[in-house]
Amino acid sequence: MKVRVFTFFKIFSIIIIEDEKLKRIGNLWDKIISYDNLYLAYKKAREGRGHLESVKRFEQNIEGNLKQLQQSLINKTFSTSRYNTRIIYEPKKRVIYILPFFPDRILQHALMNIIAPIFHARFIKDTYACIPERGLHAGLVRANSYTQKNDYCLKMDVKKFYPSIHHETLYKIIERKIKDENVLWLINNIIHSFEGDRNCPIGNLTSQWFGNIYLTQLDYFIKQKLRAKYYIRYCDDFLIFSNDKMWLNQCREEITQFLDNVLKLKMSKCDLFPVSRGVDFLGYRYFKGYVLLRKRTARGIIRRLRKLYSEYDKGRIKPDKMLSHLSSVDGYISWANSYNFRQKIDLNNRISEVRKCLKIYRSIVISAQTIT
């Protein structure tokens, strides 16, 4: 099968591989800046953050602060705050950007409350990261299914994806769908809140969505132009399966060109191999007939459990929280053929012991409440 070379790469700085008959959407601004939407955004933004001083200060006058934020949007005086940064290693080094001003977070939720459904409707069914009602487990089920049906896999990874997102290209992609000038002003403000012409800060709610919106162009290119039947993407990692090794090799060349010329991205990893070698994806390794945990995943679980056991033995973690942690590990490894690993970490016995302790702990709490 010969894959056509697309000469329009040299003509257009950006293309959309979607149905061109789709209309641009307007009349969104009033919905975004409505008090009800801002209040809903505030409730979402405070989840898990109610203990922070910035949130507590904001909540001293919720209505007044929300109306002040609303007025800054009406007057177009709002500007995204400067970011604080934090470095994490999960598993590799990443720079996380944190907005110190709580209203910034509220604003991003307010924006996405309204525009997220518009873009969500355009996402293909086989992209899973940071999308409501989809997630890691749905992705691994699909990856396992595709492994069983094919002999070869093309695995590709975008190099430093979020730091490499091109601001102007992202804006043009969004502009092809949104025509409300006020909304575009706000989106442009967020996109260009980071100095330079690239980077979509990891840590922003909008970055999760912008990343998927950006790579939706790749999804449609692969599905519609290359006609890949077995394709799956999780963030910037993606797989294409086929029984035709030569066709996959041609796909690799076309995808590399598309990323370079249209999305202004570079490939980091690219591997074409038989699935009999095992398909490494989302923390698991898929073979025909069975699934294993990745070695790195297993090592990470062991490290995590050692830390949890240490904290639990010192009384720093209560039995109910410990049981929740162990149940999470149990659920995660249950997706793989993990009998030997489960025996190695003695998970079943640990869960049984914690359940007994939890029963005793609850009886003591109830007795204490009765006495009081």
List each language-model region with its residue ranges.
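Non-catalytic, polymerase-adjacent accessory regions of viral genome-replication enzymes
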Residues: 1-67, 367-372
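Active-site-proximal segment of RNA-dependent polymerases
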Residues: 3-19, 24-28, 112-166
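Non-catalytic, well-ordered alpha-helical scaffold segments
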Residues: 26, 36-39, 63, 67, ...
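Short coil/turn segments at secondary-structure boundaries
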Residues: 41-44, 54-58, 80-87, 123-128, ...
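Short, conserved non-catalytic motifs in the polymerase core
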Residues: 48-57, 81-108, 122-134, 190-212
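Active-site-flanking structural segment that lines cofactor/substrate pockets
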Residues: 62-93
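Conserved polymerase palm-domain catalytic core
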Residues: 65, 72-73, 91, 125-126, ...
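Right-hand nucleic-acid polymerase module
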Residues: 109, 249, 267-372
